[in-house]
Amino acid sequence: SFPTRRSSDLNKEVEEGFIQFLVPYYTSMNNVESPFEIQKFVREIRSGDYNSFFQRLQSFFADTTYEIIREQELHYENVLFIIFKLVGFYVKVEYHTSRGRIDLVLQTDKFIYIMEFKLNGTAEEALQQINDKHYALPFETDGRRLFKIGVNFSAETRNIEKWIVE
């Protein structure tokens, strides 16, 4: 007979596998600093400190080797999804509404972050899309504070060029 494992043990193994193998693949972060850096992301997200969070992301992406970034917008979306999922936040990518598809929705106990990404566009265009397509509408009756965030990535610098928040 095979030993039985609790679901939480398996989840912990999966999480450790993500940290050990995927995060270093997508970034230059090593195994020692990964948990510490991820804790900083968590604190900033939980406190609604989106500027510190995006500044940390800029530094994070700047330290990522350019060879692994192929399809840039998808790369950034994947990295954000992995980080948010690892730390236990409710996160959805390509969230469908009646008017379109939100690139990323992140929910904490106090905040909802609606993020739209552009590659070689503008953060203003990304935010305008959130407003034009009424992406916040499904969340308006929720009691949590809502942040609409337009983000532009630069293919040249392979990083976040600008973000704006409403």
Task: Report the location of each language-model feature.
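Leucine-rich, amphipathic alpha-helical/linker segments
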Residues: 11-66
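Mg2+/Mn2+-dependent nuclease catalytic core
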Residues: 119-136
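Conserved catalytic cores of phosphodiester-cleaving nucleases, focusing on short active-site segments
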Residues: 80, 102-119, 133
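Nucleic acid-processing catalytic cores of prokaryotic defense/repair systems
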Residues: 82, 86-88, 127, 131, ...
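Acidic-basic catalytic patches of nuclease active cores, encompassing PD-(D/E)XK
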Residues: 59-92
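Domain-level recognition of nuclease-like catalytic cores that cleave nucleotide substrates
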Residues: 138, 142-166
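Short, small-residue-biased leader/transition segments that mark boundaries at the very start
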Residues: 1-7
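Active-site metal-binding core of divalent-cation-utilizing nuclease and nuclease-like domains
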Residues: 83-109
